[in-house]
Amino acid sequence: AGLVVALCGYLLQHFGYSAWYLCFLVPALIALLGVPLLWFGLKDDPTEVGLPPVEKMGDGAAMQKDAEPDPVSRLSKAQYKKVINRMVYANPYIWIIAVSNFCIYIIRLTILDWGASFLTEIKGMEIAKAGGLLATTEIVGGTLGMLLAGWLSDKLFQSKAHRTCFFCIVFATLSFFLFWKTESITLSFIFLIFSSFFIYGPQALFGTCASQQATKYATGTGNGIVGIFGYASSVVTGVMFGAKAEAGGWDSVFPIAIAFGVAGAIAIALMWKAPADGYEKLNKVLKEVE
């Protein structure tokens, strides 16, 4: 995402705003180049390349001969649907994660969609420089933020990634607020880096949270719901914020985005005491459906 922002800034700087369509065409062509790699290189599971299933792998990639049988494999299709329903659709933690993901994506997409406009119209930067700055915040801040968030989840919060997400959302919202209020270009750059740094922690970990709470048997469904909520936020950032900025200026947009950040922090705080994963719940559900 950061590279696309920099690319679009370069295109507009050199070809003018009348060539806006290049910002859609060029990234689309680049994306098409990746299609053959995915089609021919992406595999469904390790067995397709001669490796044993992940569940049967032990330390040092050694096969576990006495691996326990899969408790879900003996369920009927109707019973399996009940498991999915209980672990995902009737699981309040999945919906809390989804709502919180929606909120943090509001701030993320506000920066990605309108960050260049903020920097050029409010901070007075050239479009190419603004694009490069945004790319730097995404690549540097985002990458480091994801790595640190994952490390903290394991080392500090005993794999309870939702707790890491809470702190990340709080500090991402605060950084975005400070970016809005500062007039210094240098401080604006610093606060944007911090915004990306803290945003990409939840972006990476919310999928992990959903997988842990839904368990491996419903990972796809749980992540699907969380992902839909995340990208549904583009309706707010793209349509609503665009109309709001045109009518009342950018100062009318920032408070709304910040309010969503606060709401996201409150939402994820509701599952502070939640376990690291849903396998204990799964065992209870299996006993009920069998």
Where are these regions (language model features)?
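Juxtamembrane intracellular "pre-TM" segments in multi-pass secondary transporters
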Residues: 50-96, 286-290
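C-terminal membrane-cytosol helix-exit motif in multi-pass small-molecule transporters
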Residues: 29-60, 267-272
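A late C-terminal transmembrane helix in Major Facilitator Superfamily
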Residues: 216-247
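Glycine-rich segments within core transmembrane alpha-helices of 12-TM secondary carriers
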Residues: 1-8, 138-142, 227-237
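Cytoplasmic membrane-interface "Motif A"-like loop-to-helix N-cap segments
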Residues: 154-169
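Helix-loop-helix hairpin linking two adjacent transmembrane segments in secondary transporters
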Residues: 1-45
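C-terminal ends and interior cores of transmembrane alpha-helices
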Residues: 170-183
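Extracytoplasmic gate region of multi-pass secondary transporters
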Residues: 89-147, 203, 207, 237-238
